[in-house]
Amino acid sequence: MADQEMQKLIKRINELAKKAKEEGLSDLEIIERKDLRQKYLKKFRESFRSQVEMMQIFDKEGKEVTPEKVKEVQRKKGLRDD
């Protein structure tokens, strides 16, 4: 569902970008564009943060080298038992 919402945001942002280049935007459209961009960035950051929090990193020898800060977040969310 979040993916569909992101696609809708991107589509509308692109429509407004095209219109801005071709003929310019009204004041309401400028406000809408700013709002859509903020919503997009918020959702992107949430998604990226979630991906990083779920990540475990291993070196070539198979030893986990996940940064301690990420491990702490994972522990707080109950994603780790160590």
Curated annotation (Swiss-Prot):
This is UPF0291 protein PEPE_0871. It comes from the Bacteria. PANTHER family: UPF0291 PROTEIN CBO2609/CLC_2481, UPF0291 PROTEIN YNZC. It comes from Pediococcus pentosaceus (strain ATCC 25745 / CCUG 21536 / LMG 10740 / 183-1w). Its main location: cytoplasm. It is found in: Cytoplasm. GO terms for cellular component: cytoplasm. InterPro entries: DUF896. Keywords: Cytoplasm. Belongs to the UPF0291 family. Signal peptide: none annotated. SUPFAM superfamilies: YnzC-like (SSF158221).
